[in-house]
Curated annotation (Swiss-Prot):
Its cofactor is Zn(2+); Fe(3+). The gene is hutI. Fe(3+) binds at residues 77, 79, 247, 322. Its main location: cytoplasm. This is Imidazolonepropionase. It comes from Cupriavidus taiwanensis (strain DSM 17343 / BCRC 17206 / CCUG 44338 / CIP 107171 / LMG 19424 / R1) (Ralstonia taiwanensis (strain LMG 19424)). GO terms for cellular component: cytoplasm.
């Protein structure tokens, strides 16, 4: 996309007709032979085409050619901005090395830290843009992007600045998350408490004051940070009025999900080792469970998240790519829907909610994204499908016809432009 192509993308204003509408993930609320009106970049009306108010019958028309229109998709957990890649570690995994073994050998997160620190902002932007474009082409209109590969103030700032720049350049809603407590940088080896002090008292205050942070995250694991260290990060976030989320219970059960719930976290993510007490705490707090089937698949995990318990307690389940260079180098949210159904046994409506309303809730943005509703910014996707179930059914195929982001039309294979 050229620098001015966002402004040159045509307006979505007018009546979208010859379509079927899925306002949210509930198939009972689907509207066949529907119409949707966009005015000044926002949804002004939606319903059955036969009920279109007279006031809009003379408005410009957009023929959807029988497509289904859904809310724009939301990718609520990504590590999209980083330097380099880690294909060499893939070979190590195939030879039997595990996540912890690679990390302790100096690979993993810290190897990406070296590449990220060594890259300038323009290089990081170009690399991240290439990763973002396939997601845009699949109908993603809102995305979370974490830092966590800088692990010092300068490089964390660089990552977050690139994330903001991606949103401005592509006309997509980007929600930034400060993940300074992702791993120990080499210069703080064996000094985790000192590093957490830097995160809480230097990095977070500076980045929050610069308006670069929407939420705060941490990696609470035996190879990451302890419950006590994570709580210090959460307390610092609260002092700056920032919501929190947590990488929790991926490799073991440290009680991270319960900690997240005590702090009314937006989400707890991964959760392969989550127990019933953690599920109950999340339910009481309204914390979203973000499922990351790409990492589960890539790591060849065998411990499933407790889907039945999450259902039983009414915990909202979101689905995300977890795009990152080490454990989920995937750029397809549609594939994650299929994996969530096939690997985790989610239903199709659960998968649809997982990439729309529940994903938006995991960002604290369910008042802006995840549903087609009057008054909201026009973020939606048109699909060449006979039924919304096909979005979770196909894999390796992108049935998108048109994507509307922030009231602008991005068509067909050029939906990422």
């Amino acid at each position: 996309m050229t620098p001015n192509s966002l402004l040159s993308a045509p307006s979505a204003d007018g009546v979208w007709h010859h379509c079927h509408l899925l306002p949210d993930a509930d198939p009972a609320r689907a509207i066949r032979d529907g119409a949707l009106v966009v005015e000044h970049g926002r949804i002004a009306w939606l319903g059955a085409a036969a009920d279109l108010p007279e006031a809009w019958r003379g408005a410009p028309r957009h023929d959807a050619n029988g497509a289904w229109i859904t809310p724009g998709l939301v990718d609520c957990h990504t590590h999209l901005v980083y330097g380099g890649q880690r294909a060499d570690e893939f070979a190590m995994r195939l030879a039997g090395a595990g996540y912890e073994e690679i990390a302790r050998a100096g690979g993993g997160i810290v190897s990406t830290v070296r590449a990220t620190r060594g890259a300038d902002e323009d290089t990081l932007f170009a690399q991240a843009a290439a990763r973002l474009q396939p997601l845009l082409a699949e109908g993603v209109t809102a995305i979370e992007i974490k830092s966590g590969y800088g692990l010092n103030l300068e490089s964390e700032r660089k990552q977050l600045r690139v994330a903001r720049r991606l949103g401005e350049h592509f006309g997509i809603s980007v929600y930034t998350t400060f993940l300074g407590a992702h791993a120990l940088p080499p210069e703080y080896a064996d000094r985790a408490d000192d590093y957490i002090e830097l995160v809480c008292n230097t990095m977070l205050p500076a980045l929050a004051d610069e308006g670069l942070v929407d939420a705060v995250d941490a990696f609470c694991e035996s190879i990451g940070f302890s419950i006590a260290q994570t709580e210090r990060v959460f307390d610092a976030a609260a002092r700056h009025g920032l919501r929190v989320k947590l990488h929790a219970e991926q490799l073991s059960n440290l009680g991270g999900a319960a900690l997240a719930a005590r702090h009314r976290a937006l989400s707890a993510d991964h959760l392969e080792h989550l127990d019933e007490a953690g599920v109950a705490a999340m339910a009481e707090a309204g914390t979203v469970a973000v499922l990351l089937p790409g990492a589960y698949y890539f790591l060849r995990d065998t411990n499933l998240p407790p889907i039945a318990l999450l259902r039983q307690y009414g915990v909202p389940m979101a689905i995300s790519t977890d795009h990152n260079p080490g454990t989920s180098p995937v750029t397809s949210l549609l594939l994650m829907m299929n994996m969530a159904c096939t690997l985790f046994r989610l239903t199709v409506p659960e998968a649809l909610a997982g990439v729309t309303a529940h994903a938006a809730r995991a960002l604290g943005a369910d008042d802006r994204h995840g549903r087609l509703a009057v008054g909201r910014v026009a973020d939606f996707a048109l699909w060449r499908i006979d039924s919304p179930a096909e979005l979770a059914y196909w894999f390796g195929r992108n049935p998108v016809a048109t994507v509307v982001r922030q009231g602008r039309v991005h068509a067909g294979a050029g939906a990422a432009a």
